[in-house]
Regions:
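Fe-S ferredoxin-like electron-transfer domains
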Residues: 1-12
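Rhodanese-like catalytic fold shared by cysteine-dependent sulfurtransferases
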Residues: 7, 16-19, 27, 35-75, ...
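Catalytic cores of enzyme domains
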Residues: 81
Length: 204
C-alpha cells in the first residue's frame, strides 16, 4: 500500500474507532507494528498494536495468539521500518495462516515519513514519536511526542542510543540528562566496569 493511501486508511480507522468500530460499514482493520520492542517503545502509528517481541523470529507465535479467533477475511495492515520484514509477515499471514485481506506499508516508516514531507507537508503525521533507524543516527524524530521512558530515571524521552560500554552495547532509551551523567552508559555497573577494564589495561 503506497504511503499516502496508508495515511488515509489510518485516518479512516481513527474516525471509525469512535464510530462503533466500522469504516464505511466495514470492520476497522487490525494494524500491527512488526518491529521489536526497543523500536516500538519510542514511536508507533496511531491505532497500531505492537507485537512486543525481542526478535523478529518470535513474531509467528504472537500472530497465532492475536489472530486465533479472527475471521480469515479480517482486514490486516502491517508495517515495519523499511518494509522488508512485512514482506515476510504478509507471506506468512496469507500462505501459512490463510488470511485473505492483508496489506503492508510499502517502503515502511521511512518511505511514509519521506512521502508525507515531500507530497503532503500540511498533513499531521499518523506516526507519533521517533523512528528507530539502523544507522549512526539511531533514531529519526518524526513528531515531538516523547513516548519512550528513560531506563535510568523513567522520564519521558524520544532519545535512543547504544550503551558505550563495548562489552554491553545494548540499545536503550535514555534522556539527555542521564546519558550525560552516565557518560553514555546504561547503568552504574557498565560505567564502572569499563573504567576498571581501561585502568587494568593501562597498568598491564
Amino acid at each position: 500500500m503506497p504511503p499516502l493511501e496508508w495515511h488515509e486508511k489510518l485516518k479512516e480507522a481513527r474516525e471509525a474507532r469512535g464510530n462503533e468500530g466500522e469504516v464505511n460499514d466495514a470492520p476497522v482493520p487490525l494494524i500491527f507494528d512488526c518491529r521489536n520492542t526497543y523500536e516500538t517503545e519510542v514511536g508507533i502509528f496511531e491505532g497500531a498494536e505492537p507485537l512486543a517481541t525481542e526478535n523478529f523470529r518470535d513474531s509467528w507465535d504472537v500472530f497465532h495468539e492475536k489472530l486465533k479467533d479472527k475471521p480469515k477475511d479480517t482486514p490486516i495492515m502491517t508495517y515495519c521500518t523499511g518494509g522488508i520484514r512485512c514482506v515476510k509477515v504478509g507471506a506468512y499471514l496469507t500462505q501459512e495462516m490463510g488470511f485473505t485481506n492483508v496489506s503492508r506499508l510499502a517502503g515502511g516508516i521511512i518511505a511514509y515519513d519521506r512521502t508525507l514531507n515531500d507530497e503532503a507537508p500540511e498533513e499531521e503525521p499518523m506516526f507519533k514519536g521517533t523512528n528507530y533507524v539502523f544507522d549512526g543516527r539511531v533514531g529519526r524524530q518524526i513528531t515531538k511526542d516523547a513516548l519512550g521512558k528513560c531506563i535510568t530515571c523513567g522520564q519521558n524521552t524520544h532519545l535512543l542510543s547504544n550503551c558505550k560500554n563495548i562489552e554491553c552495547h545494548r540499545r536503550m532509551v535514555q534522556c539527555e540528562t542521564c546519558n550525560h551523567s552516565y557518560a553514555g552508559r546504561c547503568s552504574v555497573v557498565c560505567k564502572e566496569t569499563e573504567i576498571f577494564v581501561d585502568d587494568h589495561s593501562q597498568n598491564s
